[in-house]
Swiss-Prot record:
Family (UniProt): Belongs to the DEFL family. Protease inhibitor I18 (RTI/MTI-2) subfamily.
Cleaved signal peptide residues: 1-28
Name of a matching Pfam family: Gamma-thionin
PANTHER family given in the database record: DEFENSIN-LIKE PROTEIN 1, DEFENSIN-LIKE PROTEIN 6-RELATED
Subcellular compartments: Secreted
Main location as per UniProt: secreted
Keyword Cytoplasm applies: no
Keyword Cell division: no
UniProt xrefs under InterPro entries: Defensin_plant, Scorpion_toxin-like, Scorpion_toxin-like_sf
Highest rank taxon of the organism: Eukaryota
Name assigned to this protein: Defensin-like protein
Keywords, in A-Z order: Antimicrobial, Disulfide bond, Fungicide, Plant defense, Secreted, Signal
Annotated GO biological process: defense response; defense response to fungus; killing of cells of another organism
Amino acid sequence: MEMRKSCGFFFLLLLLVFASQVVVQTEGRVCESQSHGFHGLCNRDHNCALVCRNEGFSGGRCKRSRRCFCTRIC
């Protein structure tokens, strides 16, 4: 019986340790704006993101008729 109580206590302690390690990550809204510096058809997100970073945004991606849209956290 004593062994069973010890196992139960150990399980609860282990559960408490793992539960305290869970971190909920929240993200803000992402705002998009069409790039003013990107010219031509947007085929690669990487190129779009580089141009957007030079414009002061955090990144960018190709979408909507192959146009480059810059992104940032609002």
